[in-house]
Amino acid sequence: MRYGGVDEAGRGPIIGPMVIALVIGDSGYLKELGVKDSKLLTKEQREELFNEIVKNSLVKYEIVSPSLIDRYNLNELEAKVTANLINSIEDEISHIVIDSPERPENYKLRILKYLKKRVKIITKNKGEEDPLVAAASIVAKVIRDREIEKIKEQTGIDFGSGYPSDKRTRKALEQYYRILKPYIRKKWPFEINKKLTDFI
């Protein structure tokens, strides 16, 4: 069956963007391909599957900058970007399954505020169990990983994953805040943000 799936990567980091991806394709083919939640795959597996997904499906994504994330409620921003991606589809499809970061009913209402295209919206917790959502999670993760590598190349700093649970990320923030500042989410509820002005 051909329909759409949406998922994101990078909601939780303190460094780097969030990426939201939409994949429209054949669920049966994706199942046979071995598509599953990106968190359950190695980097090499994600890259390999990414190439197959892009070749055989319609793929759209948006890279959401830290500065934009700082300006909005994260769920509202994610819903708006998701709706924009769906609105950009020219193909007629039956429905789109979307991984929900909150109660599915609430998230659906957020999306519908911005949706212009006539399509059935299905929001789910643990949406990655759906092959199209899983494919979107792979696309989002691969694109975000590439964006993180670009930041490392531009700054010359290996800050690890960008997540606050990563010791390398914490250390990099303490040592190189001035350089990393354009890529940092200022409103992240993380104790080091209280001390960021110490490094200005």
UniProtKB/Swiss-Prot annotation:
Keywords assigned: Cytoplasm, Endonuclease, Hydrolase, Manganese, Metal-binding, Nuclease
Classification via Gene3D superfamilies: Ribonuclease H-like superfamily/Ribonuclease H, Ribonuclease hii. Domain 2
Single GO MF descriptor: RNA binding
Cofactors required: Mn(2+); Mg(2+)
Documented EC number(s): 3.1.26.4
CC per GO annotation: cytoplasm; ribonuclease H2 complex
Subcellular location: Cytoplasm
Iron-sulfur found in the keyword field: no
SUPFAM superfamilies: Ribonuclease H-like
Annotated positions binding a divalent metal cation: 7-8, 99
InterPro entries per UniProt: RNase_H2_suA, RNase_HII/HIII, RNase_HII/HIII_dom, RNase_HII_arc, RNase_HII_hlx-loop-hlx_cap_dom, RNaseH-like_sf, RNaseH_sf
UniProt remark on cofactor binding: Manganese or magnesium. Binds 1 divalent metal ion per monomer in the absence of substrate. May bind a second metal ion after substrate binding.
GO BP annotation list: DNA replication, removal of RNA primer; mismatch repair
Main location: cytoplasm
Residues in RNase H type-2 domain copies: 1-200
Catalytic activity: Endonucleolytic cleavage to 5'-phosphomonoester
NCBIfam families named among the record's database cross-references: ribonuclease HII
Family: Belongs to the RNase HII family.
HAMAP family named among the record's database cross-references: RNase_HII_A (MF_00052_A)
Function per UniProt: Endonuclease that specifically degrades the RNA of RNA-DNA hybrids.
Name the UniProt record assigns to this protein: Ribonuclease HII
UniProt organism field: Nanoarchaeum equitans (strain Kin4-M)
High-level lineage: Archaea, Nanobdellota, Candidatus Nanoarchaeia, Nanoarchaeales, Nanoarchaeaceae
